[in-house]
Swiss-Prot record:
Any Gene Ontology biological process: translation
Keywords of this entry: Ribonucleoprotein, Ribosomal protein, RNA-binding, rRNA-binding, tRNA-binding
Subunit and partners: Part of the 30S ribosomal subunit. Contacts proteins S9 and S11.
HAMAP family: Ribosomal_uS7_B (MF_00480_B)
Family: Belongs to the universal ribosomal protein uS7 family.
Keyword presence, RNA-binding: yes
Alphabetized InterPro entries for the sequence: Ribosomal_uS7 (IPR000235), Ribosomal_uS7_bac/org-type (IPR005717), Ribosomal_uS7_CS (IPR020606), Ribosomal_uS7_dom (IPR023798), Ribosomal_uS7_dom_sf (IPR036823)
Keyword Isomerase: no
UniProt signal peptide: none
Function description: One of the primary rRNA binding proteins, it binds directly to 16S rRNA where it nucleates assembly of the head domain of the 30S subunit. Is located at the subunit interface close to the decoding center, probably blocks exit of the E-site tRNA.
Name this protein carries in UniProt: Small ribosomal subunit protein uS7
Cellular compartments per GO CC: small ribosomal subunit
Any single Pfam family the record assigns to this protein: Ribosomal_S7
Organism, as annotated: Actinobacillus succinogenes (strain ATCC 55618 / DSM 22257 / CCUG 43843 / 130Z)
Length: 156
């Protein structure tokens, strides 16, 4: 943590095809070993498949899927008097996006389809319909926060 001034977050360049910063960030989350062109082709193929399946705009469908996966509350461990409590806290908007993207990518990697583009397309399609592993992860996090609502006064 800086002592003097707040550090400005780095500006991310929008992706070349759709011109979306959110999609560029998602491509970066999916990227492995710095192979961005491969990550881009996977994402664009997945979005193309998703657009054909839903009949809607690919970017719009992606944003709906991400919206359905984003968590609003999460739990953080807080140690008070020798015991650890899971304290529910609201998630900051940047972290909300980051978690949603990470969960979609993790869920897609765990699927058993042929190619990563197909796995990602299926996971995004499920997320648009409010089902799938990524949405389940969000529900679990929300349930955990709801169960620990009694400890909300330990917030810092």
């Amino acid at each position: 943590m800086p002592r003097r001034r707040r550090i400005e977050p780095r500006k991310i360049l929008p992706d070349p095809k759709f011109g979306s910063e959110l999609l560029a960030k998602f491509i970066n989350v999916l990227m492995v070993d710095g192979k961005k062109s491969i990550a881009e082709s996977i994402v664009y193929n997945a979005l193309e498949t998703l657009a054909q399946r839903t009949g809607k705009d690919a970017l719009e469908s992606f944003e709906i899927a991400l919206e359905n996966v984003r968590p609003t509350v999460e739990v953080k461990s807080r140690r008070v008097g020798g015991s650890t409590y899971q304290v529910p806290v609201e998630v900051r908007p940047t972290r909300r996006n980051a978690l949603g993207m990470r969960w979609i990518v993790e869920a897609a990697r765990k699927r058993g389809d042929k190619s990563m583009a197909l796995r990602l397309a299926n996971e995004l399609s499920d997320a648009v319909d409010n089902k799938g592993a990524a949405v389940k992860k969000r529900e679990d996090v929300h349930r955990m926060a709801e169960a620990n609502k009694a400890f909300a006064h330990f917030r810092w």
